């Protein structure tokens, strides 16, 4: 695709962009306010404007869904779509003068008519304050309202169009959802200018891209790239050979899409079309309209090459010719610009036939037909079928009857003359799908009957009937020719009346339904076959009946035509009334324009007078200022000369003083220079002496340096040897230092062991002391026991002597008892519990005397340790070495307890030899202590 290298046209109404932030804007049905934000909103599609309203009619303070887009007073902020916001009329800047070299841009494909705001209904209030400029061959008015009454719907930016310099925040408001339902041509092509105008030769790529300050994103850049190039929606519907070529001779031509005319609308649609001020027609011509900055509306109209007129095309040509006459009348009247209140004449170019388009300059590639092409072919086939209807045959058959009224205007139209104005009528558009569907589902053509001889039809009817018919024809005035849409129901109504009265009409052309091309051929073949056959004779009655049928059919056509004429008269009256209203409105507007001109001229005169007065005042002021300036300059010159003389005298005195000081300084410097020369001579002599001394000193030093170096080397070797020894010692010491923690651990271990051994030694010493005391006690006890034993022996001897003598009976009874029974009790060692250990032992019969009591009382206060020690020693002395049955591991309670007496644990058994034997647990404990158990006190 080739990019457009055209400039940009002017927009009569400024579109709000991010560059207009802070300006006063007007929101539709809301009010005025200041623009604060332009850009997208989170959660919403499209571009929105944030406005701070002057009145508290808003809904928020600039925050929407938690996101703050701008700051405003509460209930003064509102978000509105960008197409509903327009700059206030007072804020609109004055446009620069128009560039006469602007060219129109156009699309390579037929534009799709969307919801065009120019075709919307407009209120009568707006029609009063605005003038409608009708473009030639078009019935859609382009309204140019006056100041402060322009509705936002008339903004050309709302149409489906794009510009190379369009800002990223501007979008068209067209709907692309009904593309198939609105396949018609576009009557106007606009080029929107946004920014500064450029030269014709300038390239658009060199123009800086207009970007928003607050809305810079990748999406905007991507959209601008799309806007800068032409976009083809789908494939071409008209063929590659018919596409226009850039920089071609017929550059302003636009290919057309042929449409099918719809049937005649009913009365309701007709009335509705009369009420609506804006009507829509499908037109074969596509004029280009350029709206410049100064408000002039230039209409350049070029008609593409037309084919042979058909039934449908004739209707459009007739309606176009009638609309052209109205447009020429309306275009001659002056119109008003909405912004400047100035008269902007509408220049209309004469309609000139366009030259046929040249052949394509590029090779046409054969492609497989697409769906759109097939649809277009079907549509063209249906149109060709309508063109090939047998119209001549119908005219020849009806020519016998009086000519109908609508014939004359058609001939005038064919000859090129003008016709009366016909009312505009809205024709409902149907998509191609429905047209094709109707073409496919059209009723089957009726079976052709054999035509009979038409010779009796040439017989003239009676004179009375012909006079009546001739009188009925001129009774209705001819107003306007009927369109093909109006003719079709007439043709279809004729067979209905004839069939209701009697049999079908002999001619097949009056049958119901639409005639197509194949029917013509079939009818011609049937007529030829009928001529070849033999025609039977026809009776007079049948002739009269046929003539009556034809007269009835003609009367029906006359009735229909009369009704149509009445409707046309009524429509013409309405149109004339509307025209009168428009003329009155135009007169009012002219009066207003004259008043405005007068007011403007008065203002201009007043401004001229005030300007002249200001000029005179300015000249007087300049002269007075010049005089005062000259006087001030003279005074300043005198003062400057006086100051200059004073300054010159002062400077001369200073120069003299400086010369005197300079001479004195020169004399001093001469003396110093002479002294410095003498010092230089003396220094040169000293230098020579010092150089000689330095040479001698250097030789002596060089000789001494070798000796010093050798001595230093020997000292270095000695130091290195000492360093080696010290390093070895350091290594040994480091090893010893590493062994210190191990030695400390061993020392701590040995200290712990020594403490343990000391404790054990102390325990043993204490045990020995205790044992020595126990031994001494035992010796004393042994001595005491021996003494008691001797005493007992003596007493026993005495008792035995007495027994032998038989002096005492008690003694004899005792002695008479056996020896075993006497000493059986003390021979047993009794082990008692802890509770019984504290108590005293019962006295035996053998110890009933005082010695036994004394023994028991003396031994009652001894310790259990003493008892165990005695048992240990006694067992060690008395018992044999292999005797281990008596070893008992006594519990700690026996060792630690100090209560009780030995008498409670010991029992003395007197054996035959008379030596006591101790049998107790202590003996076993003693053996265990000797075997290695240490005593802990």
Curated annotation (Swiss-Prot):
Keywords from the named record: Coiled coil
One term of GO molecular function: microtubule binding
Coiled-coil intervals: 566-740, 773-800
Compositional bias per record (Basic and acidic residues), positions renumbered to this chain: 285-295, 317-353, 383-396, 409-424, 463-473
InterPro entries, A to Z: CAP-Gly_dom_sf, CAP-Gly_domain
Gene Ontology CC annotations of this record: nuclear envelope
Region (Disordered): 90-131, 264-548, 819-866, 916-937
Positions with biased composition (Polar residues): 268-281, 296-309, 845-858
Keyword Coiled coil found: yes
GO terms, biological process: nucleus localization; nucleus organization
Domain CAP-Gly: 39-81
Record's compositionally biased regions (Low complexity): 492-501, 832-844
Record flagged with keyword Coiled coil: yes
Protein name in the entry: CAP-Gly domain-containing linker protein 1 homolog
Organism: Caenorhabditis elegans
Gene that encodes it: clip-1
């Amino acid at each position: 695709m080739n990019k457009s290298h055209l400039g940009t046209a002017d927009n009569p109404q400024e579109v709000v962009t991010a560059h207009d932030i802070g300006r006063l804007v007007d929101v539709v049905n809301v009010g005025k306010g200041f623009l604060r934000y332009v850009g997208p909103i989170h959660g919403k599609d499209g571009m929105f404007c944030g406005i701070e309203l002057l009145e508290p009619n808003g809904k928020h303070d600039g925050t929407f869904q938690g996101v703050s887009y701008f700051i405003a007073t509460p209930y003064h902020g509102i978000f509105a779509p960008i197409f509903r916001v327009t700059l206030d009329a007072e804020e609109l800047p004055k446009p620069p003068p128009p560039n006469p070299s602007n060219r129109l841009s156009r699309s390579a494909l037929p534009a799709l008519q969307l919801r065009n705001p120019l075709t919307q209904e407009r209120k009568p209030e707006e029609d009063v304050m605005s003038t409608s400029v009708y473009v030639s061959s078009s019935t859609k008015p382009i309204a140019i309202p006056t100041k402060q009454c322009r509705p936002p719907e008339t903004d050309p930016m709302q149409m489906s169009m794009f510009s190379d310099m369009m800002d990223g925040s501007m979008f068209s408001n067209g709907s692309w959802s009904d593309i198939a339902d609105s396949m018609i041509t576009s009557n106007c092509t606009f080029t929107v200018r946004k920014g500064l105008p450029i030269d014709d030769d300038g390239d658009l790529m060199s123009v800086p891209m207009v970007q928003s300050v607050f809305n810079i994103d990748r999406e905007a850049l991507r959209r601008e790239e799309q806007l800068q190039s032409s976009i083809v929606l789908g494939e071409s519907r008209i063929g590659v050979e018919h596409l226009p070529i850039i920089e071609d001779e017929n550059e302003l031509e636009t290919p057309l899409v042929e449409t099918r005319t719809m049937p005649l609308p009913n009365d309701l649609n007709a009335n509705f079309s009369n009420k609506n001020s804006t009507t829509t027609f499908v037109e074969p011509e596509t004029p280009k309209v350029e709206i410049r900055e100064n408000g002039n509306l230039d209409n350049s109209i070029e008609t593409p090459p037309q084919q042979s007129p058909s039934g449908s095309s004739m209707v459009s040509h007739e309606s176009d010719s009638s609309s052209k006459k109205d447009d020429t009348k309306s275009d001659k009247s002056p119109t008003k610009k909405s912004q400047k209140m100035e008269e902007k004449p509408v220049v209309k170019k004469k309609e000139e036939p366009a030259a046929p388009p040249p052949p394509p300059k590029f090779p046409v590639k054969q492609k497989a037909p697409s769906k759109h092409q097939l649809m277009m072919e079907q549509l063209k086939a249906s149109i060709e079928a309508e063109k090939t209807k047998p119209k001549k045959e119908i005219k020849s058959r009806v020519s016998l009857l009086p000519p109908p009224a609508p014939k004359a205007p058609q001939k005038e139209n064919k000859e090129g003359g003008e016709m009366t104005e016909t009312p505009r009528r809205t024709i409902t558009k149907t998509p191609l799908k429905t047209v094709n569907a109707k073409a496919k589902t059209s009723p089957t053509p009726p079976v052709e009957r054999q035509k009979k001889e038409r010779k009796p039809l040439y017989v003239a009817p009676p004179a009375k009937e012909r006079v009546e018919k001739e009188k009925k024809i001129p009774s209705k005035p001819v107003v306007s020719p009927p369109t093909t849409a109006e003719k079709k129901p007439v043709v279809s109504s004729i067979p209905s009346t004839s069939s209701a009265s009697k049999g079908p009409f002999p001619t097949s052309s009056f049958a119901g339904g639409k005639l197509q091309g194949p029917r013509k051929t079939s009818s011609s073949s049937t007529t030829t076959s009928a001529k070849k056959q033999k025609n039977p004779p026809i009776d007079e009655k049948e002739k009269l009946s046929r003539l009556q049928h034809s007269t009835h059919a003609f009367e029906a056509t006359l009735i229909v035509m009369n009704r149509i004429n009445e409707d046309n008269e009524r429509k013409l009256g309405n149109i004339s009334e509307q025209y009168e209203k428009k003329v009155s409105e135009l007169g009012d507007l002219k009066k207003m324009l004259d008043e405005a001109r007068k007011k403007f001229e008065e203002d201009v005169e007043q401004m001229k007078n005030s300007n002249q007065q200001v000029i005179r005042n300015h000249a007087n002021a300049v002269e007075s200022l010049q005089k005062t300036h000259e006087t001030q300059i003279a005074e300043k010159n005198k003062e400057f000369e006086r100051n200059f003389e004073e300054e010159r005298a002062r400077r001369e005195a200073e120069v003299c003083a400086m010369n005197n000081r300079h001479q004195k300084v020169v004399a001093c410097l001469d003396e110093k220079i002479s002294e410095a020369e003498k010092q230089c001579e003396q220094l040169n002599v000293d230098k020579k002496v010092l150089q000689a001394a330095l040479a001698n000193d250097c030789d002596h030093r060089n000789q001494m340096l070798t000796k010093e170096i050798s001595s230093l080397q020997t000292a270095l070797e000695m130091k290195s040897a000492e360093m080696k020894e010290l390093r070895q010692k350091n290594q040994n010491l480091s090893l010893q230092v590493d062994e210190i923690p191990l030695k400390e651990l061993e020392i701590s271990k040995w200290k712990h062991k020594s403490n343990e051994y000391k404790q054990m030694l102390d325990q043993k010493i204490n045990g020995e002391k205790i044992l020595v005391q126990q031994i001494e006690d035992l010796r004393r006890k042994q001595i005491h026991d021996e003494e008691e034993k001797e005493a007992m022996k003596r007493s026993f001897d005495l008792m035995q002597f007495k027994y032998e003598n038989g002096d005492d009976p008690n003694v004899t009874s005792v002695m008479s008892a056996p020896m075993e029974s006497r000493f059986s009790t003390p021979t047993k060692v009794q082990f008692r519990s802890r509770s019984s250990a504290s108590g005293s032992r019962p006295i035996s019969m053998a110890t009933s005397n005082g010695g036994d009591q004394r023994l028991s009382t003396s031994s009652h206060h001894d310790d259990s340790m003493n008892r165990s020690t005695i048992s240990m020693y006694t067992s060690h002395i008395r018992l044999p070495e292999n005797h281990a049955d008596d070893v008992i591991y006594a519990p700690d309670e026996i060792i630690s307890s100090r209560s009780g007496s030995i008498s409670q644990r010991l029992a003395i058994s007197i054996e035959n030899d008379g030596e006591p034997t101790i049998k107790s647990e202590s003996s076993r404990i003693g053996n265990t202590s000797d075997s290695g158990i240490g005593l802990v006190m």
